Amino acid sequence: VIKQQICAFTTRHGYKFTDGKNYWTKKHLKWLKELPLEGVNKETLDSYLLSYETVSDRIDQMNKRIEEIAETDKYREAVHKLICLKSVKVLTALAVIVEIGDFTRFVKAKNFAAFLGLVAGELSSGDQNQTGITKQGNTFLRKLLVECAQSFSRASSGKSEALKKRQEGTTPEVIAYADKANERLRKRYMCLVLHNRKNHNKATVAAARELACFIWGMMTGNIHTVLA
């Protein structure tokens, strides 16, 4: 919200950042602080920037704490497995692990996807015509995985340096599973958009559903059957 307020404020006063493509970088923040504003306008922007810095510092502290929790004996191994997946970072991995607990209570991957509300519903009992996803189950995790799946719309083949670093210290078997899953999800999204002419939202939800299945496979040790 504070970012939107700052952008709206500068636009309203005729200022547009043109020295780079990315906002909220050091260069962008320096530009904001040096805008030639006076009086109440200067005070307003300074107040916005102070709020932004306060929120940013708080987020940094929380992220650091999350990293610390993820490295405890209780969560380390599971977290390190999940972050081998391209779109899954520490926060998402820890959230999924804490929310679900025992993944083996789901007999199959599709049961886990259904728990998250990521499977298609039916118009009526006995009717095979399918509607959109049910949106039943764990809303928080469903939204989290859909957000993760957004990354496949801009994913390229290959492996980024950041992903390689996240995969360090993990077994070759887990890395191989994650790599195959990452490529399959990328191709799945592209196929739905380019060949099946699905819109971005539908393709993203489909990718999120498969991502949920891969997460189930990773957490239950079924890393061969899910990709079969």
Can you name each region flagged by the protein language model?
Residues 1-81, 168-171, 178:
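Glycine-rich, often acidic, oxyanion-interacting loops/wings at catalytic, nucleic-acid
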